Amino acid sequence: MSLWGLVSKMPPEKVQRLYVDFPQHLRHLLGDWLESQPWEFLVGSDAFCCNLASALLSDTVQHLQASVGEQGEGSTILQHISTLESIYQRDPLKLVATFRQILQGEKKAVMEQFRHLPMPFHWKQEELKFKTGLRRLQHRVGEIHLLREALQKGAEAGQVSLHSLIETPANGTGPSEALAMLLQETTGELEAAKALVLKRIQIWKRQQQLAGNGAPFEESLAPLQERCESLVDIYSQLQQEVGAAGGELEPKTRASLTGRLDEVLRTLVTSCFLVEKQPPQVLKTQTKFQAGVRFLLGLRFLGAPAKPPLVRADMVTEKQARELSVPQGPGAGAESTGEIINNTVPLENSIPGNCCSALFKNLLLKKIKRCERKGTESVTEEKCAVLFSASFTLGPGKLPIQLQALSLPLVVIVHGNQDNNAKATILWDNAFSEMDRVPFVVAERVPWEKMCETLNLKFMAEVGTNRGLLPEHFLFLAQKIFNDNSLSMEAFQHRSVSWSQFNKEILLGRGFTFWQWFDGVLDLTKRCLRSYWSDRLIIGFISKQYVTSLLLNEPDGTFLLRFSDSEIGGITIAHVIRGQDGSPQIENIQPFSAKDLSIRSLGDRIRDLAQLKNLYPKKPKDEAFRSHYKPEQMGKDGRGYVPATIKMTVERDQPLPTPELQMPTMVPSYDLGMAPDSSMSMQLGPDMVPQVYPPHSHSIPPYQGLSPEESVNVLSAFQEPHLQMPPSLGQMSLPFDQPHPQGLLPCQPQEHAVSSPDPLLCSDVTMVEDSCLSQPVTAFPQGTWIGEDIFPPLLPPTEQDLTKLLLEGQGESGGGSLGAQPLLQPSHYGQSGISMSHMDLRANPSW
């Protein structure tokens, strides 16, 4: 937003006093255009300022007249414009001073109201300052040229005309001294313009580094290249004027000017060699990567040489990089830190692209030589860099030029499990390093507010969302990293966080650092939850204790989504339920990882759970998550198959009360389907009894009431609430030779019925509370189990229990054929008859 965009939003009474010397309605017509002109940089009264002020007055009148025509204003305003033109025509610098005063007042008012000026305004002012300085330099060079020609003519008439062409020095100064002084002043202005360019290059480098953390970055180097080339043109013109002045300058003055100009050129040339495409800042050995450099003055100096110079890429340590930064230092040294393959590329001009660059497409770090580390520093805290270097000769004198550019610091890893900690090192360095630092020095402690900005920037960039973190999120993060449960934002406002707290110290009661946990959240959200976060469906960064305070007074079924505090890369659902005593309770469902959500999405999981009703505070879940539900396929697919799906259920830690049920008068048999129209026979012979338990004090007499074709049916009396299946599942047979499910009596394989989400019940069997397994268990009787390779016994029934079951089976079978089976009595747990014969009952499914 522009400065005027903020001023126009302010109450009129706060800015009305600024428009005493200039009508306020005309200021409205000028709008943003006014702040796009160099009013603040015309502070002199020389010929350059006067000429530019006259041009600005004409532009102002034209802009006002055009604005009046567009808005259909009346002749009254046109009359004001005409009056304005006539007033300032005699002294255009007065108009410059008036507008400068208005803009300064507007900036002050905006600072008081909004505490900051808009960033586009800063960039616009910086651009205006450089362009105005460049125009002044061009004007100065023109004055120098006129003065030098006048001096060389050596006529009195020439000296008289000189006063009308240029600003003459103080009284008593001759033309030669005036030329020398003008050259020195212009060289000083060139040095100031060079400083602006170098500062702008440093800002570009810093922005490039911050872009590694996700900051926006205008990476085009074309504006910077244009600035550098324009300064080189000014340098060339000044150098020609110094050389052409000849005897008009003293040798000492000429040598001083030549040295200053050469230093300007040297600094520009060496500063214009930049790493345009940075190598990966977390670099794995034996992995190909790319990088690129650009020489902003290549089109000016390299031309079309027969053999373009080669750019070489080498790995350097932090110590070697520090030596490179020292003027006239020893350089990087001969010792190699790492071997890079395919590390030379020619530096070539591209006329269509208007640039001079070298792109390394197939770099590969073959190996790395670790240097000595400081104290407890790990290998993922060791920073290196890639040094790009090239050399060529400049000008007719074949002046040797050495170009060097250092990449951003990078961390070399040899295994993927080092990636997380390496990213922490790079994040910290990118965020908190200073411009023009000694490589690669960075603060050990930083203000928590800066850390919040960094985490927010990284989160938005990594996830790919425009929804950043909220103040409540930062409060939770502060509590986590400082191990402080303060509930006030002000408690953390002036605190600082250390590198150790960020990624060296293990969080209290956990097995990971703060960054490792936060990076897990980043990865999970990026891979599975971007749309949910962007739709503000996830609170995310909130403690379990705060969740309880939010949900405890909400209706049953109210839920919210939060990132797991105890696991890396997990999200959990917290919801309100009623306990057995009727009091509200908060349950947190086991966290879902990225792998879990790749199997079934978060939205579909929420749809599966009927107990979830409203997203906190009061938004119906179907309204909130409908766009995230996967459409259900109806009918058969293209191959003729009926679609199957996986659905999620949740185990209750305390099962609901079970109504008292009655044992049926008949126990049905379960046909395995191994042979048509037949059932598995089971003879209880002495030779089939497993010797697992010591012999009972008494034994069961052999039972001969069943023929080999008849079945003995044994009811499972154990309830397994974790075996919960949705009602849409099909059937499958359980092989007879599989081990018996844990917690069930050995019996013939049967088709079990499950009512989800509650304990397992057979579809056509009701249960009594006093089952055979609720009786005291004594020694295991002989002659009971049919074979130890079929279903190994868990809890041995008594002789009385077995006899009762066998007699019931005999009496109800009707001499070998089962009679009519009773209907299933109503169950508290939901629908009955959901067959799970196709499921492995030994498993503990989560769906």
From Swiss-Prot:
Its main location: cytoplasm. GO terms for molecular function: DNA-binding transcription activator activity, RNA polymerase II-specific; DNA-binding transcription factor activity; DNA-binding transcription factor activity, RNA polymerase II-specific; identical protein binding; protein phosphatase binding; RNA polymerase II cis-regulatory region sequence-specific DNA binding; RNA polymerase II transcription regulatory region sequence-specific DNA binding; transcription coactivator binding. SUPFAM superfamilies: p53-like transcription factors, SH2 domain, STAT, Transcription factor STAT-4 N-domain. It is found in: Cytoplasm; Nucleus. Tyrosine phosphorylated on Tyr-641 following stimulation by IL4/interleukin-4. Tyrosine phosphorylated following stimulation by IL3/interleukin-3. Dephosphorylation on tyrosine residues by PTPN2 negatively regulates the IL4/interleukin-4 mediated signaling. Mono-ADP-ribosylated by PARP14. It holds the Pfam family STAT6_C. GO terms for cellular component: chromatin; cytoplasm; cytosol; nucleoplasm; nucleus; RNA polymerase II transcription regulator complex. The keyword Transcription regulation applies. A motif (LXXLL motif) lies at residues 802-806. It comes from the Eukaryota. The modification N-acetylserine is found at S2. Signal peptide: none annotated. Changing L805A: Abolishes the interaction with NCOA1. Residues 809-847 are annotated as: Disordered. Belongs to the transcription factor STAT family. This is Signal transducer and activator of transcription 6.
